[in-house]
């Protein structure tokens, strides 16, 4: 069970969107779900995130985990992303930066946007989760092809509700 709606604290000028939601679960329980890429499709809820390709949990900053994706505006419809973990501070914060991996060389490149979850215990079994989508480091050439944010602002609120449903 969760309490209160997620509140969209948006700042489009600052090139990031921030939402928060209080979830009736410990930070450890919430973090465990976020560190499991096999749960990310359920957290997303749009059908864009399809499945984990590695089958392993996130355990450290610098780790790369791969996901199968689908988006109608992507040239291939189905594609893969390689996410590099930027922050791993169990059970307080986790963040990753999506990118691509060249199949021929395995070389990774990243687009400059980051998904970050900050968790704060607000009671014995209550956590305030703050989700930040930050695209401030996206270079101009990428911005010519992708509009930011590439989803409606309700997407982040919905993601936190899905996370709450999975944890509780």
Q: Residue ranges of each PLM-predicted region?
A:
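Glycine-rich portal/gate segments that line the openings of hydrophobic small-molecule binding cavities
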Residues: 52-104, 165-166
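A generic structural micro-feature
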Residues: 11-13, 59, 75-79, 107-111, ...
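Hydrophobic ligand-binding cavity/cleft-lining segments
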Residues: 2-56
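Short, P/G- and charge-enriched loop/turn segments at secondary-structure junctions
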Residues: 6-8, 70-73, 103-107, 117
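Beta-strand/loop substructures that line and gate deep hydrophobic ligand-binding cavities in soluble
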Residues: 97-154, 158
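Hydrophobic pocket/interface hotspot
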Residues: 30-34, 40, 65-67, 85, ...
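Hydrophobic/aromatic beta-strand elements that line small-molecule binding cavities or substrate pockets
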Residues: 19-21, 80-87, 112-121
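A short, structured loop/turn motif at beta-sheet edges
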Residues: 24-28, 58-59, 86-93, 118-128, ...
